[in-house]
């Protein structure tokens, strides 16, 4: 699996240390193991996880600004865990409301010795952002409107929302509530992943 990951990283033009590669492979191993009992992801094949979970997460790393991020609705740690591995100088709060997912995240944190993640069990609207975050990341929300509505209290004044989407639909972007601007829509190229992938970057107008 390490060889396959290395080939995928080469295709994506991503350079990582051997330690980071080993951590990513170990994460996939833990996800595969826990998934059998806890149903953390619909992706069952570890090789498919490399593309749909690992590569699809870390491909956004170059576009993140700041050092404190929160991954809302992280599930089994996506994209937060892979991003924490490839961005060791940044800190990632991993927020999810389900206890089984947060237990898994704490096990990953322990086994991979990740000191730059904080798993938290909470609903997003009940989570106090003190201090607020440089970036709010998610691939869990059905719409951009939902994301900024539920997470409005999380970013700093100059912070950003980073929404990982399939299609970047014009109607969805035009329906953002007042007070938010689309900064950029980035087309992502994930090797061996079918379908379109986009990163939509949003900021509060106050910034």
UniProtKB/Swiss-Prot annotation:
Binding of S-adenosyl-L-methionine, residues: 73, 78, 124-125, 139
Keyword rRNA processing among UniProt keywords: yes
Entry keyword Glycosyltransferase: no
Keywords: Cytoplasm, Methyltransferase, rRNA processing, S-adenosyl-L-methionine, Transferase
Superkingdom of the source species: Bacteria
Subcellular location field: Cytoplasm
Reactions that this protein is recorded to catalyse: guanosine(527) in 16S rRNA + S-adenosyl-L-methionine = N(7)-methylguanosine(527) in 16S rRNA + S-adenosyl-L-homocysteine
EC number of the protein: 2.1.1.170
Any GO CC annotation of this UniProt entry: cytosol
Role description: Specifically methylates the N7 position of guanine in position 527 of 16S rRNA.
Family assignment from sequence similarity: Belongs to the methyltransferase superfamily. RNA methyltransferase RsmG family.
NCBIfam families reported in the protein's UniProt record: rsmG_gidB (TIGR00138)
PANTHER family: S-ADENOSYL-L-METHIONINE-DEPENDENT METHYLTRANSFERASES SUPERFAMILY PROTEIN
Name of the protein: Ribosomal RNA small subunit methyltransferase G
Species this protein is from: Klebsiella pneumoniae subsp. pneumoniae (strain ATCC 700721 / MGH 78578)
